[in-house]
Amino acid sequence: MNEAIIQLDHIDITFRQKKRVIEAVKDVTVHINQGDIYGIVGYSGAGKSTLVRVINLLQAPTNGKITVDGDVTFEQGKVQLSANALRQKRRDIGMIFQHFNLMAQKTAKENVAFALRHSSLSKTEKEHKVIELLELVGLSERADNYPAQLSGGQKQRVAIARALANDPKILISDEATSALDPKTTKQILALLQELNRKLGLTIVMITHEMQIVKDICNRVAVMQNGVLIEEGSVLDIFSNPKEALTQEFITTATGIDEALEKINQQDIVKHLPANALLAQLKYAGTSTDEPLLNSIYRQFEVTANILYGNIEILDHIPVGDMIVVLEGQAENILAAEKALHEAGVDVSILKRGA
């Protein structure tokens, strides 16, 4: 089992503006394991970016304890490292942002090399390092291009290479794909996954998009108004969201709400027979491999008319979502519901026939 590389314990962050006190983060505890791709999701103003800046103490918390890679960096209201040790610790943490923050007058390779200006490497070693980093992010052929000559995705690749220049153990991505088109976003997420696998890099993803969490993360924390309201594996959160905000994020990411709107306009649903009901079936893991609807027809003579179906792969595990009309004798439908529950399927009745 991997150990926690980032431990944020009971973090409070308070700002004072004139006569107002703003509680940006309230008693948040997050532990992130080595090798995780960990998502922190929430709407603008939720406190997620403020929280993540305490990892490298770009933002000092008001209260709480921070441990990074085994070292306590902040406790009892004070930074626990010397200035030199803090600088070294920050080198272990790379950051990328929505706006790429590249220097317009420097080429791609010069932007990456800038991050090595305090490195103990020789000039030749630095040059080799820059070439290796640009190859790693798939941009070696653009080494001599200036930012103005690069697309948004290419600029972000340069920013990623620069963030990796000092061989960090942790990479923080603060809305790094927000300015990119969907195709480029997928390419950047695929690159981050590859870096996670190749380098054993721990990645913290700050985002307002649950789709990104679904595509890349293995664990997720949901924040609202400075409070962590839900946390767990992506599989658990998507399979069984407990909080209303989490459910809202997930329905947006899966498109189930939009599907239901269209389904409710269909004649079969508008005029549901007395011996039928509209149900949503959610299932995960081995349940997705079983011919469950065929099984309930054979056992209970309950037919299933599939109006919507979707299977996602979350952290290597298939997760299914289906909207069906179940039709049969009332007692048989009850028996079929029970059989589905016993097979690990969550059954929600959306409408009963009149």
UniProtKB/Swiss-Prot annotation:
Pfam families per record: ABC_tran, NIL
PROSITE patterns: ABC_TRANSPORTER_1 (PS00211), ABC_TRANSPORTER_2 (PS50893), METN (PS51264)
Binding site for ATP: 42-49
Segments crossing the lipid bilayer: none
Record keywords: Amino-acid transport, ATP-binding, Cell membrane, Membrane, Nucleotide-binding, Translocase, Transport
MF (Gene Ontology): ABC-type D-methionine transporter activity; ATP binding; ATP hydrolysis activity
Quaternary structure and partners: The complex is composed of two ATP-binding proteins (MetN), two transmembrane proteins (MetI) and a solute-binding protein (MetQ).
Protein name (Swiss-Prot/TrEMBL): Methionine import ATP-binding protein MetN
Membrane topology per record: Peripheral membrane protein
EC number: 7.4.2.11
Top enzyme category: translocase
Residue span(s) of domain ABC transporter: 8-250
Signal peptide per UniProt: none
SUPFAM superfamilies: ACT-like, P-loop containing nucleoside triphosphate hydrolases
Main location: membrane
Gene Ontology CC terms, in alphabetical order: plasma membrane
PANTHER family: AMINO ACID IMPORT ATP-BINDING PROTEIN, METHIONINE IMPORT ATP-BINDING PROTEIN METN
Subcellular location: Cell membrane
Function (record text): Part of the ABC transporter complex MetNIQ involved in methionine import. Responsible for energy coupling to the transport system.
Annotated S-S bridges: none
Catalysed reaction equations from the record: L-methionine(out) + ATP + H2O = L-methionine(in) + ADP + phosphate + H(+); D-methionine(out) + ATP + H2O = D-methionine(in) + ADP + phosphate + H(+)
Top-rank lineage group of the source organism: Bacteria
Family: Belongs to the ABC transporter superfamily. Methionine importer (TC 3.A.1.24) family.
Residues forming coiled coils: none
